[in-house]
Amino acid sequence: MNNEWLNAYVLHRRPYRETSYIVDFFSLEEGRISAVAKGVKNSKSDKKSLLQPFQHLRLQLSGKSDLKNLRHVESVAPSISLTGTALFCAMYVNELTNRIMPQGLASDGVYSAYEAALLALRDEADIEVTLRQLEFALLDEMGLLPDFTSDVEYEMPIEENGRYHFQLDAGFIQIPDDVVGARGIPGTALLSLSQGEFTPLSKKVAKVLCRDLLKPLIGDKPLKSRELFMTKPR
């Protein structure tokens, strides 16, 4: 890794000793990786100014342990400008990626979805769709994204007019037609999600599903970005 240049974004940084930072990066080539940026905390160096979220960087690291040393860093593109709700959502994107992606697991799919989410937030795209697409990419990488096309109990295709129960550790199970008053998830919403289509109905379904599926990955520790968003002035 000593001579390899990595494409990366800063997910989080925190003070380390008196003059340094520990920086969590998300890279295309090596996945999530942490490194010490030595002597930059109280400096006015370019290196310190670059170690900010939402900026595409190239960096070189050294070291054999899980905690690397940052040797070189340079900008690939200007920082992605975000304000208001988009900024809070981007903070959520960073925190969620940092919380879920295992150290050292490279994923082209998640990296592409992560970068696309930041650019979509900058461009004021539909926030619900932007966040769900990233969450789906993370769940898919972790092997937890359900099959939106098949009933796991009967091994039959999802029916557009059917209604389904979601079982967290299995998938979607059709509710029999003779069950009175059962609401369930409309098959039409599942089929939309299987095609990557976010209709008003499928967006609502996706939000609930992601909340339930992400909970075991996030754990009991609350996401700070969520707390900040809830307390921001309206």
Swiss-Prot record:
The organism's place on the tree of life at top rank: Bacteria
Keyword Secreted listed: no
Database matches in InterPro entries: ARFGAP/RecO, DNA_rep/recomb_RecO_N, NA-bd_OB-fold, RecO, RecO_C
One Gene Ontology cellular component: bacterial nucleoid
Biological processes, Gene Ontology terms: DNA recombination; double-strand break repair
Pfam families documented for this protein: RecO_C (PF02565), RecO_N (PF11967)
Keyword entries, A-Z: DNA damage, DNA recombination, DNA repair
UniProt keyword Lipid metabolism, yes or no: no
Protein task: Involved in DNA repair and RecF pathway recombination.
Family as reported in the entry's similarity comment: Belongs to the RecO family.
Xref: HAMAP family: RecO
Protein name (database record): DNA repair protein RecO
Natural source organism: Alteromonas mediterranea (strain DSM 17117 / CIP 110805 / LMG 28347 / Deep ecotype)
Gene that encodes the chain: recO
